[in-house]
Amino acid sequence: MIDFSPVSNGEKKYIDLWREQAITIDDLRDMTNESIDYLLGLLEDVEDADIIFEPTDPDAHDPHAVEGEEMIGWTLGHLIAHVTASSEEGAAFSSLLARGVEDVKNRPRYETPWREIDTKAKAIQRLEESRQMRLAYLDTWPDQPHYENYRVAKTEGFAEYFGALNAPASFLMGLAHEVGHYDQIKEAKRQALAARATA
């Protein structure tokens, strides 16, 4: 997997990674499969109860959550719903931008209600469905993508923080968000397995 730390550290933007590493559409496909396969691997030894186990998370703070859920620890099902939605959003942006659609600013995002992912089978299904969707978005790229077409930033702060976002940069942004949640997913799993072992 590509090292996203230069972006998270504020040293580079996503478009810099694309340019400097000459990332191709096939690379984006490979990264997608690598991330999905990694997450599926994390689920190999979990059970249904682990998917809905609510971990303790002292850092939990989601200002976008519904009232009363801002400070809850995220279950494995919640995390999978969230990271797949963000990666699919990045892939959807990439399709629009690569095809030359102009004035792209509204977020093409849908997040599966996390409480619906309440079994291991549903978590696996959501991941495989997300793989299918992301790869399908990449298949919509034309032979000559419009790399000079950029997402319209809604705020100056967004533009300053993320930089210019063309098709590959938008895809990388969604994937980086997913990778950034790996440790949280592993910790939620660790707590779930520990709780089951002592039950």
Whereabouts are the PLM-identified features?
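Aromatic-glycine hotspot motif
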Residues: 1-77, 81, 86-199
